[in-house]
Amino acid sequence: MAEQVTSAKATAKTVRIPARKARLVIDLIRGKSVAEAFGILKFTPRSGAYLIEKVLKSAVANAENNFDLDVEDLYVSEAFVNEGPTLKRFRPRAKGSASPINKRTSHITVVVSVK
């Protein structure tokens, strides 16, 4: 007998936002219902809110389409941000020197489950 699936997951890899900035937004939605999380993300003026909203939408769509879960009963059971690869660049400076510029990326993961 097949076990009933109660959660769905979505991941965005190598997103061009530092993990430190994305974590400030992801902490706001962890443990909230999906409807409340969308409301919070819509009115959060931080740079990562739009990207995290896209991942949350994808997780909800996965739950609905792949596992036939009811959207009204879903909540954000897990939400975390890991560091991705860093793009290393150099800015030319005075007297022939150069300063490093690290363009950081992150992996955003959101898991929604049935209450």
Curated annotation (Swiss-Prot):
Superkingdom per UniProt: Bacteria
GO cellular component term, pick one: cytosolic large ribosomal subunit
Gene3D superfamilies: Ribosomal protein L22/L17
UniProt xrefs under CDD domains: Ribosomal_L22 (cd00336)
Keywords: Ribonucleoprotein, Ribosomal protein, RNA-binding, rRNA-binding
Pfam families per the UniProt record, alphabetical: Ribosomal_L22
InterPro entries attached to this UniProt entry: Ribosomal_uL22, Ribosomal_uL22_bac/chlpt-type, Ribosomal_uL22_bac/org-type, Ribosomal_uL22_CS, Ribosomal_uL22_sf
Membership in a protein family: Belongs to the universal ribosomal protein uL22 family.
Function according to Swiss-Prot or TrEMBL: This protein binds specifically to 23S rRNA; its binding is stimulated by other ribosomal proteins, e.g. L4, L17, and L20. It is important during the early stages of 50S assembly. It makes multiple contacts with different domains of the 23S rRNA in the assembled 50S subunit and ribosome. The globular domain of the protein is located near the polypeptide exit tunnel on the outside of the subunit, while an extended beta-hairpin is found that lines the wall of the exit tunnel in the center of the 70S ribosome.
Name the record gives this protein: Large ribosomal subunit protein uL22
Organism: Ligilactobacillus salivarius (strain UCC118) (Lactobacillus salivarius)
Name of the encoding gene: rplV
